[in-house]
Each structure stands twice: as C-alpha cells, then as structure tokens.
Amino acid sequence: MHHDLLIVASEVLFSPFMDGILKDWTPSRPHGSSAGLSLSGGIDSTACMAIMPDDTVLLHHRRSFKSLLKHDGADSLFKHIERTTGRTVHSIPSDHENIRVHWGKSVGFSTDMAAAVHLILLADHFDLRGIAIGMPLDNTYLWHGFRYRDFSTTVWWQRWGSLFKSIGLDIILPIAGVSEATAVRIVQDAGLGHVVSSCLRAKHPGCGRCWKCFHKNGMLGHPYNINSREIQTFLSKRPVRTATHALWWVNEQNHWDQVPDLSHMSELDFSWWTKHHPPAFDLLPDWIRPVIQSAIETATEPIPVDSPFHTWNLFPDAD
C-alpha cells in the first residue's frame, strides 16, 4: 500500500480532531486504471452504479459493531446484483465510525469522505484512479438542500477534490447534477426499484417510519406512516431537512396539511427538480465523463437557464 493512502485515510478520519496530519507531506502516488464506487445499497449510490461503467469496482462499508442500523436491505440488493449481473460487491467491515466517540460525539462518519475510507485504503489493491460517492444535487448545488450555490467554488470541492487528485484518485460525483427524485428514476429505469431500499432500520421495503422511508422509499411505492414520530419531527423543523426534495414530495403527494405554515410554497415551480444541471458534468474527470453524461442526458432533460433553480432559496432568513 502506498504511504499516501494512509496519510489521506488519516485525514478523512481524524482531521476534525487533529491538526497537521498533512504537514511536511509530499504526495507521490500515481493514478491507477479503474473507478471505484462507495456502494451503500441505498438509492443514491445505486443510481451511481447504474450510470457508471460496468467494470466499476463496487465496495460497501459494513459496520462491524453492534448497531441499530441494519444491512439486510443492502445485502438483498447485493445478492440480486451478483445473481443478475455476475458482479461482486466487496463488503468491507470497519468500526471507524466509533472514532468520534472518543471526542464526545455520536457514532458516525468523521467527515463526508470518511464514507469512502475503505476505497482509499484499498485503492492500490483494486488499482483505482477514481472514487465515486452518491452525492446528489440536494447536497452539491443546494446548500443544506434549500439554497442555490455554485458547488465548484465551495471549500468542500476545492479541499477534497485537490487532495484526492494529488494521490491519483479523482473524486467522481456521478449524480451531482441531479436530485434525489431523479436518482430514484434512474434506479427504476435500471430495473432495481423492486429490490433497493434506503432504509437502514428494517429489511426491504423498510420500516415505513423513518425519514428515508418518507422521502426516498416512498417514491418507490413503499409504504410510510406520515404520522410517525421521526417523520413528523423532521417536517416540523425549519428549515425542513433536505428541504427541496422533501417539499417537492409533499407537493407530489399533497401533504401540505402536514406543513400548513409552508402551504404557500405549493405555488412554487418545482418542475426543474426532475431535470439535470449541466455544469455538474464539468466536475467529472475526462476519462469517465462521457459514459456518465450520456446516461444522465438520456434519463432526463437539462434545467432551463431561466429556471428558478438558479436563484433558489426556500428559507432566506436561515443561516
């Protein structure tokens, strides 16, 4: 394993708690030849798999410690993938989500890119030149899901993009220019809508009570209880969590009675939500861009230049 991979793995896991990890370090790892995908088994990463080359290496992060989160849904999808395509999903056990606990925080990823640390550490083994993650437009060109921004100029992209590129690993964001709604459509078009689930609480089709069952699995026709505690809690927050997608779904299902103070938003033009943002293609490395761009352009139309998306701000008073 190249030393650079250990350095960057340490950065994604420990940088929120330790300074100077990259000090006096000069990267030197050459790029490999293959693309790798952090495949959680949820809708967003499955959509990435559907539009990436068939030889993309599929790697899953599996919690190796006792947890409320379940891998049953993901395992069902992985078995289906292997049975129908012959492709292998490499499930890598790890307890790195416990690192945060030592600094008084809850279990979880130390940074966004910690979700791909298994790909970093196995980059030489699989000869990787790029790492893909399922980050939709909701998290890229929309700040906290409700306010437009130019993602290419963000600190996130400039920090992680340049760091990974320096060790021969391009960050690949296949669905950066499409919403969660379009990700669902891509999964359905790939014939995987009946086996995929973003719920981590129960087996397929999900628990029906969590936020993911509401705004993700619900689009696949899976049942959800709008009155469940978690769904009601998130609907009552301002700004609403994953606001644009959640309110688009509220509009689609006519759930405005659940958010009466936001009922005026039913007059907004959400039509762009199922289209794609062409500038996101510029984030893709040249060596993989044609395949992904072609798939997205086939699946959906571009967002018009006069769309309200370009000035979108659902909660202008929010910090």
Regions found by a protein language model. Give the residues of each.
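Metallo-beta-lactamase
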Residues: 40
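Nucleotide-activated chemistry modules centered on ATP-dependent adenylation/adenylyltransferase
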Residues: 4, 9, 17-35, 43, ...
